Amino acid sequence: MAEYQHFDGETFITFDIVSVNERTNEVQVAVTNRGKISVITYDLCTDENGEYFEYGCMYEKIYLNEFMEA
């Protein structure tokens, strides 16, 4: 599973890609935030830097190409 750690200013949040659906442009991600694990489906977007999904109230871009195989 591909994993990415994001620092939100207070703590690290871990994202693990569960699946990517190119047909519906969605990515399913297991999010570990402060000890709680949630599986969330995000819309995939694309810009000049690649495919990403938006996370949090500030809609931070989390790029799929930043994930590393765990």
Model regions: which residues?
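Acidic, low-complexity, intrinsically disordered interaction modules
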Residues: 11-70
